[in-house]
Amino acid sequence: MENKTASDYNDLPLKAPKLKGILLILFLVLLDQGTKYFAIRYLRGTSGITLIDSVLNLRYLENRGMAFGLLQNKILFLVLICIVFFMAIIYLFIKTPATFYYRPLLYTAAIVFAGAMGNFIDRVFRGYVVDFIYFSLIDFPTFNVADIYVTCGITVMVFLMFFRYKEENDFDFLKPGNRSAR
């Protein structure tokens, strides 16, 4: 019986990881849009819903900018930023080797893409992003489910780059002409 090393497992091909990533994106975007539909239907025009007194509230907000209220009413600029961001994530998704080693990167990229897509849909079809989750305990800016995807996804990507993909050649696959780093 042959002993397998960690490197052997890292090089194992994944079964349809990009299809799974696309399905994950679709599911997460639908979940985000469903929660925004709830916010529009049940929170707009009300004072909101208190889930945990003095801690967590649901309240309707139309955000015409980006995170923390930056770039208010600059929709064309925000749409262009999103398109560039989508192109970068798609490039990463296409070029990343479909191996066990890169599975966390592929799925994290899908989560970030889903969050950006959820807010992009709002900007294009509504002219604003629907936000509705408010932590009153710390007076944190109101946000939505897509924001959670982007924030958590980027955080995980940073950790991956510092702790998993720290070898010099781990991202060689992104260089022009290279097919795979491993």
PLM regions: where:
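Alpha-helical transmembrane bundles and membrane-interface segments of multipass inner-membrane proteins
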Residues: M1-R182
